From Swiss-Prot:
Keywords: ATP-binding, Helicase, Hydrolase, Mitochondrion, Mitochondrion nucleoid, Nucleotide-binding, Nucleus, Ribosome biogenesis, RNA-binding, rRNA-binding. The gene is DDX28. This is Probable ATP-dependent RNA helicase DDX28. One of its GO terms (cellular component) is nucleoplasm. Expressed in all tissues tested, including brain, placenta, lung, liver, skeletal muscle, kidney, pancreas, leukocytes, colon, small intestine, ovary and prostate. It is found in: Nucleus; Mitochondrion; Mitochondrion matrix, Mitochondrion nucleoid; Mitochondrion matrix. InterPro entries: DEAD/DEAH_box_helicase_dom, DEAD_box_RNA_helicase, Helicase_ATP-bd, Helicase_C-like, P-loop_NTPase, RNA_helicase_DEAD_Q_motif. The lineage of its organism: Eukaryota, Metazoa, Chordata, Craniata, Vertebrata.
Length: 540
């Protein structure tokens, strides 16, 4: 037994040595054996590094010339001379922003032109006299606003249609001069009509309906100097002070020829029979997209029912049986405008006027988007407010609007700025009416350079002195973004204007991607154009 074990072991070794091995080649006796000088694991690491270097992107050649979109990564820049096709897909700078790894990324939509679209194509020969305005109205305009010399594009299209007695839907970008486009024809029409004092309660002949007290004060401030020169009395009717204040406002004598009112206050006055709309000759819904929202729609419907809207221009000829001419004005319009007009007027009597840049990204305003974590927003805002780069300013120093999505955020952020010794004003809808009075006027007079506010300050308010808009909370809709961004770059602004938006949530990123794609294609923002261009339904 002891001798058999070595024999078996020897036979096993012989089999292993004589058996062919996979992957081995027979070498000649003179061929040297390979020598391993680098460990196999280290050699694999070197090969992986070399493959990574080969796969690195090639350096981007930056071509000279202005940019339309400038991103942190140069390969995502888009030159100003390039426009994407409607169906052409392109890598977006915000493509991966829903990932946490995208934090601190940023891109900007640069200025494509220096002038606002509303004044860029003005003819040197155009004037308000060419639009059909009477000399008395032209003289009043010269006295009230001597800086207004030429009509804007919107005014040149709107004023003649209103003078012909047409109902008008005017949809144009913010800051394009829409207020004067309806005030001047309104006042001229009232000059040619007698005042009927047959009612024991106030009965204005012109009504301008606006969504907020601040906007009512602003429109009244524009209309009063014009009316004073023409012998017409302009007053406002605001809510928030109770019925006693409404009765006091309406009891003032003589009664107003033109009334600028908010829906809530006017609805209360109509319900209490403190005012009549039977002699109305002109009805304007300013910021109509807001007035047709669910929060105001029931009130506006009631006001329209109490107004005698003319079916066409022929109904406006009888001065002793007054009918109202209807005007809807706004920078954006919701769906259903046609259905609303069909309830009160003939579709054939309505003229729709839209500007070429309606619902488009403003080409003369720089817009920057920052992808931030929620906890970093306060530090970034404080840095922006304390270190605004004055070297880039081409004009006088402007003011800053900081938008938040809720009143509580405005208050909380105000305490933070107080801790940093940053002087500011606050404006939000939950403030008592007595506190809100005069806040925006103080901001316009530059008593403070910074205003923290909600969207109450984004609708229609004149802000020609605003240089910077900061969206601390990104707006929930594209309509809100258009209105907020429209606080800068307005007609008559002395500063070019910039918008900075903090992007935090995934739903914010979805809106930013729509904005970026529209800017790269130079097209209007999606989901807005159809609400204005839809045909009016035929009466049944």
């Amino acid at each position: 037994m002891a001798l058999t074990r070595p024999v078996r072991l020897f036979s096993l070794v012989t089999r292993l040595l004589l058996a062919p091995r996979r992957g081995l080649t027979v070498r000649s006796p003179d061929e040297p054996l390979p020598v391993v000088r680098i460990p196999v694991a280290l050699q694999r690491q070197l090969e992986q590094r070399q493959s990574r270097r080969r796969n690195l992107p090639r350096p981007v050649l930056v071509r000279p010339g202005p940019l339309l979109v400038s991103a942190r990564r140069p390969e995502l820049n888009q030159p100003a001379r390039l426009t994407l096709g409607r169906w052409e897909r392109a890598p977006l700078a915000s493509q991966g922003w829903k990932s946490r790894r995208a934090r601190r990324d940023h891109f900007s939509i640069e200025r494509a032109q220096q002038e606002a679209p509303a004044v860029r194509k003005l003819s040197s020969k155009g004037s308000f006299a060419d639009l059909g305005l009477e000399p008395r109205v032209l003289h009043a305009l010269q006295e009230a606003a001597p800086e207004v010399v030429q009509p804007t594009t919107v005014q040149s299209s709107t004023i003649p249609s209103l003078l012909r007695g047409r109902h008008v839907v005017c949809a144009a970008e913010t800051g394009s001069g829409k207020t004067l486009s309806y005030l001047l024809p309104l006042l001229q029409r009232l000059l040619g009509q007698p005042s009927l004092d047959s009612l024991p309660i106030p009965a204005p002949r012109g009504l301008v309906l606006v969504p907020s007290r601040e906007l009512a004060q602003q429109v009244r401030a524009v209309a009063q100097p014009l009316g004073r020169s023409l012998g017409l009395l302009v007053r406002d009717l605001e809510g928030g002070h109770g019925m006693r204040r409404i009765r006091l406002q309406l009891s003032r004598q003589p009664s107003a020829d033109v009334l600028v009112a908010t829906p809530g206050a006017l609805w209360k006055a109509l319900k209490s029979r403190l005012i009549s709309l039977e002699q109305l000759s002109f009805l304007v819904l300013d910021e109509a997209d807001t007035l047709l929202d669910e929060s105001f729609l029931e009130l506006v419907d009631y006001i329209l029912e109490k107004s005698h809207i003319a079916e066409g221009p022929a109904d406006l000829e009888d001065p002793f049986n007054p009918k109202a001419q209807l005007v809807l004005v706004g920078a954006t319009f919701p769906e259903g405008v046609g259905q609303l007009l069909n309830k009160v007027a003939s579709p054939d009597a309505v003229t729709t006027i839209t500007s070429s840049k309606l619902h488009c990204i403003m080409p003369h305003v720089k817009q920057t988007f920052l992808r931030l974590k929620g906890a970093d927003k306060v530090a970034e805002l404080v840095h922006i407010l304390k270190h605004r780069d004055r070297a880039e300013r081409t004009g006088p120093s402007g003011t800053v609007l900081v938008f938040c999505n809720s009143s509580s955020t405005v208050n909380w952020l105000g305490y933070i700025l107080d801790d940093h010794k940053i002087q500011h004003l606050r404006l939000q809808g939950q403030m008592p009416a007595l506190m809100r009075v005069g806040i925006f006027q103080s901001f316009q007079k530059s008593s403070r350079d910074i205003l923290l506010c909600t969207d109450i300050a984004s609708r229609g308010l004149d802000s020609t002195g605003v240089e910077l808009v900061v969206n601390y909370d990104f707006p929930p809709t594209l309509q809100d973004y258009i209105h907020r961004a429209g606080r800068v770059g307005r007609v008559g602004s002395e500063v070019p204007g910039t918008v900075i938006s903090f992007v935090t949530h995934p739903w914010d990123v979805s809106l930013v991607q729509k904005i970026e794609l529209a800017a790269r294609r130079r097209r209007s923002l999606p989901g807005l154009a159809s609400s204005v261009k839809e045909p009016l339904p035929q009466a049944t």
